[in-house]
Amino acid sequence: MRAVVLALTLALVASQSVNFAPDFAASKTYVYKYEALLLGGLPEEGLARAGVKVISKVLISAVAENTYLLKLVNPEIFEYSGVWPKDPFVPAAKLTSALAAQFSIPIKFEYAKGVVGKVLAPTAVSETVLNVHRGILNILQLNIKKTQNVYELQEAGAQGVCKTHYVIREDAKAERIHLTKSKDLNNCQQRIMKDFGLAYTEKCVECRQRGEALMGAATYNYLMKPADNGALILEATVTELHQFTPFNEMSGAAQMEAKQMLTFVEIKKDPIIVPDNNYVHRGSIRYEFATEILQMPIQLLKISNARAQAVKILNHLVTYNTAPVHEDAPLKFLQFIQLLRMASSETINAIWAEFKAKPAYRHWILDAVPSIGSSVAVRFIKEKFLAGDITIFEAAQALVAAVHMVAADLETVKLVESLAFNHKIQTHPVLRELTMLGYGTMVSKYCVEHPNCPAELVKPIHELAVQAVANSKFEELSMVLKALGNAGHPASIKPITKLLPVFGTAAAALPLRVQADAVLALRNIAKREPRMVQEVAVQLFMDKALHPELRMLACIVLFETKPPMGLVITLASILKTEKNMQVASFTYSHMMSLTRSTAPDFASVAAACNVAVKMLSNKFRRLSCHFSQAIHLDAYSNPLRIGAAASAFYINDAATLFPRTVVAKARTYFAGAAADVLEVGVRTEGIQEALLKLPPAPENADRITKMRRVIKALSDWRSLATSKPLASIYVKFFGQEIAFANIDKSIIDQALQLANSPSAHALGRNALKALLAGATFQYVKPLLAAEVRRIFPTAVGLPMELSYYTAAVAKAYVNVRATLTPALPETFHAAQLLKTNIELHAEVRPSIVMHTFAVMGVNTAFIQAAIMARAKVRTIVPAKFAAQLDIANGNFKFEAFPVSPPEHIAAAHIETFAVARNVEDVPAERITPLIPAQGVARSTQQSRDKLTSMIADSAASFAGSLSRSSEILYSDLPSNFKPIIKAIVVHLEETICVERLGVKACFEFTSESAAFIRNTLFYNMIGKHSVLISVKPSASEPAIERLEFEVQVGPKAAEKIIKVITMNEEEEAPEGKTVLLKLKKILLPDLKNGTRASSSSSSSSSSSSRSSSSRSRSRKSESSSSSSSSSSRISKRDGPDQPYNPNDRKFKKNHKDSQSTSNVISRSKSSASSFHAIYKQDKFLGNKLAPMVIILFRLVRADHKIEGYQVTAYLNKATSRLQIIMAALDENDNWKLCADGVLLSKHKVTAKIAWGAECKDYNTFITAETGLVGPSPAVRLRLSWDKLPKVPKAVWRYVRIVSEFIPGYIPYYLADLVPMQKDKNNEKQIQFTVVATSERTLDVILKTPKMTLYKLGVNLPCSLPFESMTDLSPFDDNIVNKIHYLFSEVNAVKCSMVRDTLTTFNNKKYKINMPLSCYQVLAQDCTTELKFMVLLKKDHASEQNHINVKISDIDVDLYTEDHGVIVKVNEMEISNDNLPYKDPSGSIKIDRKGKGVSLYAPSHGLQEVYFDKYSWKIKVVDWMKGQTCGLCGKADGENRQEYRTPSGRLTKSSVSFAHSWVLPSDSCRDASECLMKLESVKLEKQVIVDDRESKCYSVEPVLRCLPGCLPVRTTPITIGFHCLPVDSNLNRSEGLSSIYEKSVDLMEKAEAHVACRCSEQCM
């Protein structure tokens, strides 16, 4: 038994000692046959592909222990561009010969236990050739485990370290080892790959979970024979597949297939001869990038003399782009860039030195240099600017382009840094900003490539920030923060947070806009470190003491970090107790909009927001749009993997009309990546105030002293910061800020000063002289708009590239000449141009050519083989015109002259093809369309006959199938007939031509696609497509000499009439109806007034078949329903089970039907008849009146035939009637359009529009009128008609086509948004009614013949000026002042008091117990400007109100006496006879209004102060919101934070709040007669606080009588107290003054005095 166990053990050990790793014995040469193939295209056969094949013998021999030689013998290179698999490979003999020397050199490599180590080769072997050797070595790379047959690992190979699966099977009988390994190239620890142009994109992980755009995998199959020291590879087969599709893979994909075969031939004893070349270490098996990084895949250039070739192309670009842009200009520009990339710095400098003095050449070089894409470009720009060779504008343009096009490496980053901190750059503010932003961008791009980039890269910016803070250079600090935001380095979080209020003390001295920039600078950092930024953003958001704008910006940053569910729920919890309405509205709207997000990367956030919104109250949804809002809209298509998102942030701080900040951002999703394409932010702090208020009031010592004396009496007064007029704007592309501008008063003043300077006037005069002499301008702009590349190795060792290029060249040619009559003197004023006849003749020829390429394939410096999509777009739109302007005579004339048009004014061609070419034989490149021509038209006459016979047998069914779909089932047809039907389906061609006005315009569209293979978007794009647009003179009509458009205004309009209009006084019906209408008049004389429906839109439409009794019942019903419309509206709106019926709401007119606008017109029974009376009295106003304006549009033809249109307008002021007649100029054409409008009253206007032959074919009536719906004011617009033209069938066809592209959920969404109900309304009438249910809400009702649509409670952004629309009397003398007043009135906020109830600006009501004889601040400007102040006191004797207004240089007192309101201005009484009163500036007006008096001063911020015996009200303008204080509040919309005392403290007691705004006295002998003061009071009882007896003092001042006075009337007040131990000492003077800053320990009641009586001894 022991012997058996020993034998088994020895057998097991022996079996484990077998070495499966390949081994090559010493002193032997192993000969293999090697074949490698790389082929790209679509997976279907019969289509074109492009590829490369390499065939060779491979010799492997050992030269030392673990060191081997590998040599290729007789290598051959083949190209492929043809129809697969029919066409053969073509030998690239010249390329093989050129590379033969390199291939003949053997390479060395280390190899042990199946693992390839170092690779050594002479320097004479190029990296591309060495990579081909690495492709062979990659086959030998085998990590074989002795104890496992199935396993996986991350294996190093030519393509990186990727996940590899091994399966080993031993065939002991055949003595063979079968090994299979497979690689997942999408699962790599280190994938060798180079990306260009993708630094600004973000990986959308969630998008890629649904499918990768680029997928790759490889399988390796080995057949090996065991040997003593290892295994011998007998055969190795490699198959690798890369698949790319921008859409979902189910739509189809392009693929690149690599195959390798290594077959053992023999073993030779002759060793490989080692050459004398010096072998150097050239890396490992990992692929090394060569010159393919600089090589564009769209063309292959053989560079022999870079400078000479570049100069040749430069000459071509200049020579062939003097007229319209040459169609190959973009391609030549790309060739020029390619040559500059390959050239040395010395060569580029030599080209510049040769052509820098030639403007035509200079700009081509400067536009091409940034596209070099390396540090060479930045160094060139730096050197030339510092040397003074390029201007500031040229440097700025080149720097912006270079920063975004140059690849970021450490050298480039350091170059941009040195440029940003260069002294010469620092002296130019624009260049400094651009370079600082660019430096941040370069750091960001570098960190994308190197995630562990050092913090030292942003250290210089951090130091600059510290210096800016220390020196209080806020503008510089803002720029530095934007640079840090561009860099997005995590090391910047600490320096940024030091500038924020929560984290650093430096923030206290910083302006709000700088703090806002600091918050926004965190956004790009959040993309790399979302968790760290979330911690900062949450703390900012939670700090309720921060300015609301900072908290809302923190909310933006927080949601961009894609917070988890827990954090979103935390925000919702905070929102429940949020008192700031701006923050609450913004956060809730942000969450609400994100709940509808369909973007994959925001799916988790959308789910979290759904939960959070449900936790919150619906009251947030009802907030006005005056509050801050966030809007997010997106759409994402899973099949196409394309999406777009738009976000808009509206940040306000005081519910004003103009927001404080507006940010709009667009984001796109494509092929598993996302990018913030564009973002624009505008800050309007102070702009509205600067536009609407008067210039700053002069520092009048008396005025300022008076106001400051008043506010000094307030307890612990703190003024608000003055809003400095400032506007700022920034623009971001792909998440990087490229430019920003701050505009303040100093900049505006400088611009105005520059505009009025003598140099500016001289510049204007010189420009005018140049125009008079004739000037020609030419501008050419080439641009490499896009270069996106991804390069990675294949198993063969050749690189595969996916790339996208767009290059364009635009040119504008302008020739302009001006003529002035009479000629101006040498020195003239601009006003003289208004009295001059100006003629301008111009010729323009703009042209653009754009080339776009999408490439997939092999790209090296030696050979290219790829499939390519190429799009060419070219537009040329020449024009020649003349314009004449005679302002003095009211004439404007424009003439367009014919030009020789190009063959096509716009052309677009798209084609896809396979191309193969090599550098040794570039002219012999082989191009094959992806869909071969023979594949499209493959048929024979015999097959056509058979097909015809088969179709004839089943014509009906076949035709039905063809009409239903473009996809045809071929199951019933033989396979040889399928291509014929496919060819019929694939080809599409359409031409549409329109001839009008002597011009023939044609649109041509042709398409041949691969949709016959699979009807998806991807296959529809494959093939050839073209769109052509041409505009040419019509051959069937006489030539057009010119087109004229002329406008004549004023008394000379009649002189321009070409066609005299004559209209019959009796309106006749069109032919065929005249007899019938006359017969009706004879037989039924009462039909007109009885049963015929009125053609006027103002009358109700009633059917002629109704009886009088039914009409009477109808009227009774209408009357009853309208009387109860108010209550029914409320009940129906609130009742969930009762649907709203808009027909129940009847419109009651404001005007009387019998009212007329002219004494000449007799009263009639309806307003419609009054319109007809006016119309019939003078059917054509041209018989009595001269035209007010005439417009001529005509063609001047070679045969002198008049063609065109004439528009004349007549105005009859007596009847308020406007008539416009448009007529064809052709004397044989009686077509006209007649429009008559009459203002029947202040509440109604009616218009009739008729057209056709003599305006009799068709007509419509339009009526707009105001009235009431229930108690609410309303406006109604009605459109009625007798006959309308039919809509052409072609229009309906296009409508159906468009409707097919509308997503199915849209109608349902609109149905929920706008409810509708089917009604049988008037068949010839549309009625639109808007009801103002309140100043801020509307009900909208639309009635059409078949349905009624309505929307209730539509919120408005501003209040409706009901009172102001009827009374614009304050400034009747000036229309500008009227508009200004109305605009201010619309957005003003109101504070009022009726009896003892005060309603604040924020609409919060509270009862006020006013102290007698003491002034209280009702409302005042709380900034340091003190533009106005309104005081109120109650007289001690009569207890009547007395208002004092301090504004500008006047002091206004308003009080009542027995006979009415008394007005005093600066102590002088203004009698009623002297009202209205205006101050000397005219900006303040006092006038009677109703039973009281109103003061108006909107330009000072005070819209109105109204005062009568029983009430008063104050209105402040929109731009003062948030800047007021007093009893009326801040007017910031924050009704939860209404009770703010002068110190800024928020109190809960309305009484304490009201008393805090009392102006106390220091003595009872004070002239104000106020006998009270504010002081902290001691609680009358002792309390136990913290287990100690304590004495307590109020932390809020309480109104008390002065010493020596006794209270006559008191009121209870609940206030906070701060407690101290009983034994503690409190200095009465110092302690009580600081007690107001203490914390509240308890709330208790105290007594406040509101009336006092003093003794005579009181001082």
UniProtKB/Swiss-Prot annotation:
Upregulation: By steroids (estrogen).
Region feature Disordered, mapped onto this chain: 1090-1163
Positions with biased composition (Low complexity): 1090-1111, 1119-1129
Disulfide bridges in this chain: C1391-C1528, C1414-C1564
InterPro entries given in the database record: Lipid_transp_b-sht_shell (IPR015819), Lipovitellin_superhlx_dom (IPR011030), Vitellinogen_b-sht_N (IPR015816), Vitellinogen_b-sht_shell (IPR015258), Vitellinogen_b-sht_shell_sf (IPR037088), Vitellinogen_open_b-sht (IPR015255), Vitellinogen_open_b-sht_sub1 (IPR015817), Vitellogenin/Apolipophorin (IPR050733)
Tissue: Produced by the liver, secreted into the blood and then sequestered by receptor mediated endocytosis into growing oocytes, where it is generally cleaved, giving rise to the respective yolk components lipovitellin-I, phosvitin, lipovitellin-II.
Keywords: Disulfide bond, Glycoprotein, Phosphoprotein, Signal, Storage protein
GO biological process: cellular response to estrogen stimulus; cellular response to heat; response to estradiol; response to insulin; response to polycyclic arene
Coiled-coil region list: none
Any Gene Ontology CC annotation: extracellular space
Glycosylation sites: N1089, N1627
GO molecular function ontology, one term from the record: lipid transporter activity
One Pfam family per UniProt: VWD
Record note on modification: Phosvitin, an egg yolk storage protein, is one of the most highly phosphorylated (10%) proteins in nature.
Signal peptide region: 1-15
Domain VWFD, first and last residues per copy: 1389-1565
All copies of domain Vitellogenin, residue ranges: 24-662
Function: Precursor of the major egg-yolk proteins that are sources of nutrients during early development of oviparous organisms.
Protein name: Vitellogenin
Species annotation: Oncorhynchus mykiss (Rainbow trout)
